């Protein structure tokens, strides 16, 4: 039976100094011997998805104490990708994932904590904490801050825009048909509450996937930040983590540990949910990195196989203007998606979770479309938006009159009525992406699933934006944005502004954008990212020239540069003779912190996970 890790600092004559310091934090003799639970909060006033988390660590801590544990809270950093977007700040977004993972590891191991509650929410915070949890492998429960309500506005002439979000504002900003007054109205209405942005963007996608993989409670992915029902998730997380700690340290039950939960089967289930719900392409990056920490062998080819067999059951903003996270919740949330996949035989029902002995047991209680959902499930998924601008969590007691259980035309469809027979994410291969590239097919009109056009090559996101706004980009172009990968950026920027500006200029359905960088979860259209190898690693994307023909075939999973092997070899030799794989004419300050990240960054095809072996020695 494993001893409490915290005994290292709380027991023995030689630890008198450590105990003295623990006492200075408020601990007493009675606390030495209880499991110490690290509460990793991510409160910050910079991020709407985290602005309401200030007091929620105390809520968890109170529940931990009532259950017989001792909670100690600390904070991590949290970058707002939307505010960091479109300028040099975006270089820091993906690297912050590694800093968050490291900071959680540092705090937990430095203080010998026994268990962990991760209070996360937005884009890189949930993934960073997930990497840490799998690395530490101590009893852990995730609870996120919850989704933002969708916006609404009345613009000129009384025209109502009933559903708005951040992307609406970005696209409207470059649409010449939108007046300054209307733009101001949209801007002020797009993000009405605290919480992670209201669509199936990266933050909400990842919070849904912690639920699918089994490390958070039912409803974690879809319950709104403003919903009173969300409060119980924080309280239950505190109770549950103490129970998990007792099972491990007192009963030697290793089944409660993150790596025992996030098994290969659990990862396959999570990827099935991901492609079924049309999650952000960033989820592929983050789950691949998490698999590395979990010691699970998952490749892009595996994900591609899942995407070919699992249909798209759910289209939420930005893939649809009809549905937002509040609608996913009303339709039963992640348990409903899992249930539809389970009934179609597309899931492994055996993996257990932090709260249930198996996925099947989980669904028996929490799938509102199943034969006998629990009263708790029915109550939870009735939680509705408040419709009031606020940054207060749990402020809405509104309830939907009915649940959306329409499997034919509702927010979450059955396999028989799927949006498409294949999933909402796809992996493409070809001479332009030998190791793979990722596209969110749920956000691409089927008329664009095959596309052929001349390349317009730019060496940075900034140049791409300039090309769009100055009219260099024409209908039919395939925009190639290169040297924006994990090393080449460095930091693998998101291309939300280029995709939003294409949409705003009416070019979204008429162009394609291909990059070795990333796309925001808010991006839609024919946006192909994570091209691997990246340009800075000698990938074929470095050899593309203006006017080269690019062929995209999503059904065939193909991404090709229509240039002969002989010509490509000639171009490669010339490029290497000229000094190698570096952007031309780009001036970009790169700090020491970013250089350190670049030195250890691996390919997007392996989740851009760090490899210290790249440092040598």
From Swiss-Prot:
<keyword id="KW-0408">Iron</keyword>
<keyword id="KW-0100">Branched-chain amino acid biosynthesis</keyword>
<feature type="binding site">
    <location>
        <position position="494"/>
    </location>
    <ligand>
        <name>Mg(2+)</name>
    </ligand>
</feature>
<keyword id="KW-0001">2Fe-2S</keyword>
<keyword id="KW-0479">Metal-binding</keyword>
<dbReference type="GO" id="GO:0051537">
    <property type="term" value="F:2 iron, 2 sulfur cluster binding"/>
</dbReference>
<feature type="binding site">
    <location>
        <position position="197"/>
    </location>
    <ligand>
        <name>[2Fe-2S] cluster</name>
    </ligand>
</feature>
<feature type="binding site">
    <location>
        <position position="123"/>
    </location>
    <ligand>
        <name>Mg(2+)</name>
    </ligand>
</feature>
<dbReference type="Pfam" id="PF00920">
    <property type="entry name" value="ILVD_EDD_N"/>
</dbReference>
<feature type="modified residue" description="N6-carboxylysine">
    <location>
        <position position="124"/>
    </location>
</feature>
<feature type="binding site" description="via carbamate group">
    <location>
        <position position="124"/>
    </location>
    <ligand>
        <name>Mg(2+)</name>
    </ligand>
</feature>
<dbReference type="InterPro" id="IPR004404">
    <property type="entry name" value="DihydroxyA_deHydtase"/>
</dbReference>
<comment type="similarity">
    <text>Belongs to the IlvD/Edd family.</text>
</comment>
<dbReference type="GO" id="GO:0000287">
    <property type="term" value="F:magnesium ion binding"/>
</dbReference>
<feature type="active site" description="Proton acceptor">
    <location>
        <position position="520"/>
    </location>
</feature>
<keyword id="KW-0028">Amino-acid biosynthesis</keyword>
<dbReference type="InterPro" id="IPR042096">
    <property type="entry name" value="Dihydro-acid_dehy_C"/>
</dbReference>
<dbReference type="InterPro" id="IPR000581">
    <property type="entry name" value="ILV_EDD_N"/>
</dbReference>
<dbReference type="InterPro" id="IPR056740">
    <property type="entry name" value="ILV_EDD_C"/>
</dbReference>
<keyword id="KW-0460">Magnesium</keyword>
<dbReference type="GO" id="GO:0009097">
    <property type="term" value="P:isoleucine biosynthetic process"/>
</dbReference>
<comment type="function">
    <text>Functions in the biosynthesis of branched-chain amino acids. Catalyzes the dehydration of (2R,3R)-2,3-dihydroxy-3-methylpentanoate (2,3-dihydroxy-3-methylvalerate) into 2-oxo-3-methylpentanoate (2-oxo-3-methylvalerate) and of (2R)-2,3-dihydroxy-3-methylbutanoate (2,3-dihydroxyisovalerate) into 2-oxo-3-methylbutanoate (2-oxoisovalerate), the penultimate precursor to L-isoleucine and L-valine, respectively.</text>
</comment>
<feature type="binding site">
    <location>
        <position position="122"/>
    </location>
    <ligand>
        <name>[2Fe-2S] cluster</name>
    </ligand>
</feature>
<keyword id="KW-0456">Lyase</keyword>
<dbReference type="GO" id="GO:0004160">
    <property type="term" value="F:dihydroxy-acid dehydratase activity"/>
</dbReference>
<dbReference type="GO" id="GO:0005829">
    <property type="term" value="C:cytosol"/>
</dbReference>
<dbReference type="GO" id="GO:0009099">
    <property type="term" value="P:L-valine biosynthetic process"/>
</dbReference>
<comment type="pathway">
    <text>Amino-acid biosynthesis; L-isoleucine biosynthesis; L-isoleucine from 2-oxobutanoate: step 3/4.</text>
</comment>
<dbReference type="InterPro" id="IPR020558">
    <property type="entry name" value="DiOHA_6PGluconate_deHydtase_CS"/>
</dbReference>
<dbReference type="Pfam" id="PF24877">
    <property type="entry name" value="ILV_EDD_C"/>
</dbReference>
<comment type="pathway">
    <text>Amino-acid biosynthesis; L-valine biosynthesis; L-valine from pyruvate: step 3/4.</text>
</comment>
<keyword id="KW-0411">Iron-sulfur</keyword>
<dbReference type="InterPro" id="IPR037237">
    <property type="entry name" value="IlvD/EDD_N"/>
</dbReference>
<comment type="subunit">
    <text>Homodimer.</text>
</comment>
<protein>
    <recommendedName>
        <fullName>Dihydroxy-acid dehydratase</fullName>
        <ecNumber>4.2.1.9</ecNumber>
    </recommendedName>
</protein>
<feature type="binding site">
    <location>
        <position position="81"/>
    </location>
    <ligand>
        <name>Mg(2+)</name>
    </ligand>
</feature>
């Amino acid at each position: 039976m494993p001893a409490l890790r915290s005994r290292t600092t709380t027991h023995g004559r030689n630890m008198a100094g450590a105990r003295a310091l623990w006492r200075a934090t408020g601990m007493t003799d009675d606390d030495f011997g209880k499991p110490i639970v690290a509460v990793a909060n991510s409160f910050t006033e910079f991020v709407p998805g985290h602005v309401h988390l200030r007091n929620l660590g105390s809520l968890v801590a109170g529940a931990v104490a009532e259950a017989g544990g001792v909670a100690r809270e600390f904070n991590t950093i949290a970058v707002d990708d939307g505010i960091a977007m479109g300028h040099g700040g975006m270089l820091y977004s993906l690297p912050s994932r590694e800093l968050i993972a490291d900071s959680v590891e540092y705090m937990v191991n430095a203080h010998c904590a026994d268990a962990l509650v991760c209070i996360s929410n937005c884009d890189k915070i949930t993934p960073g904490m997930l990497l840490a949890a799998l690395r530490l492998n101590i009893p852990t429960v995730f609870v996120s801050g919850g989704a933002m309500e969708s916006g609404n506005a009345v613009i000129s002439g009384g025209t109502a825009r009933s559903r708005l979000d951040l992307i609406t504002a970005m696209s409207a900003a470059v649409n010449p048909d939108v007046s300054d007054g209307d733009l101001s109205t949209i801007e002020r209405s797009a993000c009405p509450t605290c919480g992670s942005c209201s669509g199936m963007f990266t933050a909400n996608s990842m919070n849904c996937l912690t639920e699918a993989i089994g490390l958070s409670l039912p409803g974690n992915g879809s319950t709104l930040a403003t919903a009173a029902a969300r409060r119980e998730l924080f309280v239950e997380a505190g109770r549950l983590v103490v129970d998990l700690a007792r099972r491990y340290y007192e009963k030697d039950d290793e089944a409660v540990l993150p790596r025992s939960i996030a098994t290969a089967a659990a990862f396959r289930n999570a990827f099935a949910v991901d492609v079924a719900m049309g999650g952000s392409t960033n989820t592929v990056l983050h789950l691949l990195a998490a698999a590395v920490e979990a010691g699970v062998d998952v490749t892009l080819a595996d994900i591609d196989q899942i995407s070919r067999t699992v249909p798209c059951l759910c289209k939420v903003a930005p893939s649809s203007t009809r549905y937002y996270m509040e609608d996913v919740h009303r339709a039963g949330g992640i348990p409903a998606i899992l249930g539809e996949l389970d009934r179609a035989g597309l899931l492994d029902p055996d993996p257990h979770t932090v709260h249930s002995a198996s996925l099947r047991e989980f669904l028996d209680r929490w799938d509102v479309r199943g034969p006998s959902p629990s009263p708790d499930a029915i109550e939870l998924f009735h939680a509705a938006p408040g419709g009031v601008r606020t940054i207060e969590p749990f402020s809405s007691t509104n309830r939907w009159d009915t649940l959306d259980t329409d499997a034919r035309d509702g927010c979450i469809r059955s396999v028989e009525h799927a949006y498409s027979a294949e999933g909402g994410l796809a992996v493409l291969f070809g001479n332009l992406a030998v190791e793979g590239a990722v596209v969110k097919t749920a956000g691409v009109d089927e008329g664009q699933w095959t596309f052929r056009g001349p390349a317009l090559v730019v060496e940075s996101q900034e140049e791409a934006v300039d090309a769009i706004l100055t009219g260099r980009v024409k209908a039919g172009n395939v925009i190639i944005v290169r040297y924006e990968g994990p090393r080449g950026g460095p930091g693998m920027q998101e291309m939300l502004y280029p995709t939003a500006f294409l949409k705003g200029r009416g070019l979204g359905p008429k162009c394609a954008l291909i990059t070795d960088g990333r796309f925001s979860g808010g991006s839609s259209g024919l946006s192909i990212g994570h091209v691997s190898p990246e340009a800075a690693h000698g990938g074929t994307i470095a050899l593309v020239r203006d006017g080269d023909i690019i062929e995209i075939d999503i059904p065939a999973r193909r991404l090709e540069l229509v240039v002969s092997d002989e010509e490509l070899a000639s171009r490669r030799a010339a490029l290497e003779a000229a000094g190698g794989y570096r952007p031309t004419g780009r001036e970009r300050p790169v700090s020491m912190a970013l250089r350190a990240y670049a030195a250890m960054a691996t390919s997007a095809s392996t989740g851009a996970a760090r490899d210290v072996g790249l440092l040598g020695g």
